[in-house]
């Protein structure tokens, strides 16, 4: 049997028989490797990530497909660009943009060795602002990143930073299921308090991780550390951390304090962070510096300037779109025809009528209400789209319960599927 991807990823001796030449390994993961690759067509560099699907559980495979979907749906200068993906012989290949200056974790460790060489305030601010712009784009497109950490912040020689690796780890869903210790290969420094407490999470969990990362950029160390998970959890829930260096302004340090708030209902959204006067002023300075940067293309400048201009012209009141995380919203209603995937050995899709009303999901055989089955929204963990490559059907969404049970439904259209997911998320207080 031929090696997987032999016509796509080859070595220097492959000649014109492949699209990319493998130039060497740059990373190792639980299920495979990442390589620097060179395009045979134009000589440009990219990253080829190869994963062994045979070693993955069904959940891990869903995470891999989710990463592909998230990357493919993103088009932003501060997010690693998706190029293509292929699957052969139980192997998955994802080709994506190459960042030529390593990652932020490496940079922090390098600066922190010996006498710490702190970032200058404008350097730290511009790093943070670019990550905020990336996260604003992700959240505005109804996605979560779920794995924000310094190792996933990639650096380039142009000065642009790029967010990569969308939530391929087990981090959030497994933590909610209460299996933190057996899941993490490392200590979950960036995990939000609501996840340690096994509560529902939403985009505010990404914001917490962003706050931890900002502290790390400014302080050259993580705000919370301990010798074991129990100790780390205690520190995170207490919200105590060492003061940041005096080389940073009090206004900048207050941004960290404002983000690392234990209650997600009191934690700002990214849009609310942009309204902080210090950050708002920083955005204007960032645009000025961006326009003068000759290493960045005009097309990229235009995208970022347009986004910042929209942010600066918008107003977000503190109570706008406010909701309580984990509080059931009894005012949410939605109803319509769906197909439901049955359980057992003979799984099949059956037409059903689904509705959300008075804090309950009610499933019946038909619109007349025959054979009703109810589920309190208190028992619902979340809802999300299922990729076609996984469901083998269009417009499928999954509903996950607090007890770990999953149910799949097929909507009548893509728009209908999005409405169902959003309605369920609003009903359980996470959207």
UniProtKB/Swiss-Prot annotation:
Sequence positions that bind ATP: 26-34, 49
SUPFAM superfamilies: PH domain-like, Protein kinase-like (PK-like)
UniProt domain Protein kinase: residue ranges: 20-279
Keywords for the protein's UniProt record, in alphabetical order: ATP-binding, Kinase, Nucleotide-binding, Serine/threonine-protein kinase, Transferase
Top-rank taxon, per record: Eukaryota
SMART domains: PH, S_TKc
Example GO molecular function: ATP binding
Residues at the active site: 147
EC number(s) stated in the UniProt entry for this protein: 2.7.11.1
Catalytic activity: L-seryl-[protein] + ATP = O-phospho-L-seryl-[protein] + ADP + H(+); L-threonyl-[protein] + ATP = O-phospho-L-threonyl-[protein] + ADP + H(+)
Domain PH: 331-429
Family annotation (PANTHER family): CAMK FAMILY PROTEIN KINASE, SERINE_THREONINE-PROTEIN KINASE NEK1
UniProt family annotation: Belongs to the protein kinase superfamily. Ser/Thr protein kinase family.
Protein known as: Putative serine/threonine-protein kinase A
Organism: Trypanosoma brucei brucei
